[in-house]
């Protein structure tokens, strides 16, 4: 063979950081979908509770420090229901916040969210029912448009 060198991947150091090992990358965009709103809400609440308390996530023994979370539900009237879900999971609600947009337009909401992320420095940002405030739903599914906001 010429100068070809074969290196097995077992010899390569992984550079991926995980929020939830092998399921949810750290500082990346992840989408959770499900046919049951209750099941999706329960999973989100469990993930947020683990991050807020510094607990390991299911099937993941990674130790972590407690982190902050912005949990933004864009559906009107959900704040009380969200808090109840978080309390059921024994989340540390002092590490979890939402941004009060006061009926602002989509672009203003994005700007407010950017400011909140910069100020609060969350380990995790959860955007629920975001399609209700997006002018173009396709933007929601374009990681190139959403990721710069979440990577700050």
What is each residue range found by the language model?
Residues 10, 36-38, 103-105:
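Short, acidic/glycine-rich phosphate-metal binding loop used to engage nucleotide
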Residues 2-5, 41-45, 70-73, 98:
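N-terminal start-of-chain detector that recognizes signal peptides
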Residues 19, 62-148:
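Conserved inter-motif catalytic segment of the P-loop NTP-binding fold
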Residues 1-19:
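N-terminal pre-Walker A segment at the start of P-loop NTPase domains
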Residues 26-59:
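Glycine-rich P-loop/Walker A and Walker A-like loops and their local beta1-loop-alpha1 context
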């Amino acid at each position: 063979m010429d100068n070809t060198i074969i290196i097995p991947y077992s010899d390569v150091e992984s550079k991926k950081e995980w929020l939830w090992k092998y399921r949810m990358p750290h500082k990346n965009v992840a989408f959770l979908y499900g046919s049951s709103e209750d099941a999706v809400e329960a999973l989100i609440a469990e993930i947020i509770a683990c991050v807020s308390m510094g607990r390991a996530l299911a099937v993941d023994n990674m130790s972590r420090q407690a982190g902050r979370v912005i949990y933004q539900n864009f559906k009107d009237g959900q704040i009380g229901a969200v808090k109840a879900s978080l309390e059921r999971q024994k989340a540390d609600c002092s590490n979890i916040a939402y941004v009060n947009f006061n009926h602002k337009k989509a672009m203003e909401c994005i700007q407010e969210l950017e400011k909140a992320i910069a100020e609060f420095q969350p380990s995790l940002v959860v955007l629920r029912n975001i399609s209700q405030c997006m002018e173009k739903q396709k933007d929601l599914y374009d990681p190139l448009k959403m990721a710069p906001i979440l990577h700050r």
